[in-house]
Amino acid sequence: MAQVNHDIPFFTQLLRQVFTRPIKIVHAAPVGGGDIHHCYQIVLADDSHFFIKCNHARYANLLEQEHYALAALKQAGAIKVPAILGTGECEGYCYLVLEWLELSTSGDETALGRQLAQMHQHNSDRFGWAADNFIGHNAQQNAWCESWATFWREQRLLPQLMMALKNSRGRMLSKYVDDFIAASDALLEHHNPTPALLHGDFWGGNKAYLASGEPVIFDPASYYGDPETDIAFTRLFGGFGADFYTSYNYARSLLAGASTEEAIAAAQASNLPEQVVQRQVLYNIYHQLNHFNLFGEGYLSDCEQAISNVIKFTR
C-alpha cells in the first residue's frame, strides 16, 4: 500500500465535495481497514463521525465498485451495511465516505444467519453482475451467464488459474488444470442454483456487530451466484459459530418452502450432504488461488491439495 500524507485541510476539502454544510474537523486519525486503502476516522465540531477510505486516483474503480456493491446490499435490506455518504476524487486521490459505526467482533450470530438467508432470497435470472469488480485488489470478472458451471469455470477459476500460472512457483499447478476444470464441470453439471445476491467475500473479517448485537457486513465483492459460495468461505478461515449455521439453515429452509419440522431437521443436521461438502471445497479454491495470487506461496500447498481433492471427487 503506497504511502500517502493526508491532513485536516485535505479532508476538509474532500468533505466539502460531499456535503453543503460547513465543515470544521476536530479529529482526523488513521484506523485499520484492510491492506489496500488508507482508512480514517473523521470527527466534526458538531460531533458527526465519518469513516473515509482513500487511495491514489488510479484505484478509483475499486472504490466505485465497492460503492455499487454496498448500495445493492443496502437496497436488499436484509443485513445492515454502512451508509454510503459520498464517493469521488480530491487532489489526486479517490475516496469513499461511509457512516462511522462503533463495531465489535461479537454479537447476534443467530440474526446474522437469518439475515444472510434473507439476503440470498434476492435473485436474478442470470449469474454475474452489472460490472466486473474486485476480490481484494485482484480483478473479478462478472460477465452474465445462464449456466452456473460455465460461470464458475470461465469467470472464477480460469482467471485465477491463469494469474497463478504467470508466477514461477504457481506454474506447478499447470499439471492439474485440465483435470481440475473437467472435475469442476462434473461437480456442477447437475447443480442448478437460483442466482442469489452474494456478499462475495464473506469471511470473518468482513462482518461485525453493533453494541446492540445487530450484525453489520462490509467490504463486499458482490455478484449473483450460488449461495453456497458465501457459506463455503465462512468455513475456510473460521470465525462463525454453530448458532450462525443453525439459524441460516433453518431460515433458508423455511424461505424455500419447507415446513417448520423440515426446517428444524435441516438446522439440526449434523452432517452436510457429500455433494455440498465437495462443492464447498471447489468454491473455496477460488479464494485460495486468489490468496496465492495476492500474498504468495504460503497458500500454494493449500491450493494444490484442494485441487487434488476435487479431481479425486470425480474419479
Features from the language model and the residues they span:
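A general structural signal marking secondary-structure boundaries and capping sites
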Residues: 22, 77, 88, 120-127, ...
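Active-site Asp-x-Gly
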Residues: 141-153, 162, 191-197, 209-288, ...
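Short acidic/polar mixed-charge low-complexity motifs
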Residues: 22, 46-50, 214
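An alpha-helical support segment within catalytic cores of ATP-dependent transferases
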Residues: 7-21, 124-197, 210-212
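ATP-binding pocket architecture of kinase catalytic cores
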Residues: 29-150
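ATP/Mg2+ or Mg2+-diphosphate-binding catalytic cores
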Residues: 59, 258-261, 291-315
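Canonical protein kinase catalytic loop motif
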Residues: 198, 203-204
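Conserved N-terminal boundary motif of the eukaryotic protein kinase catalytic domain
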Residues: 22-29
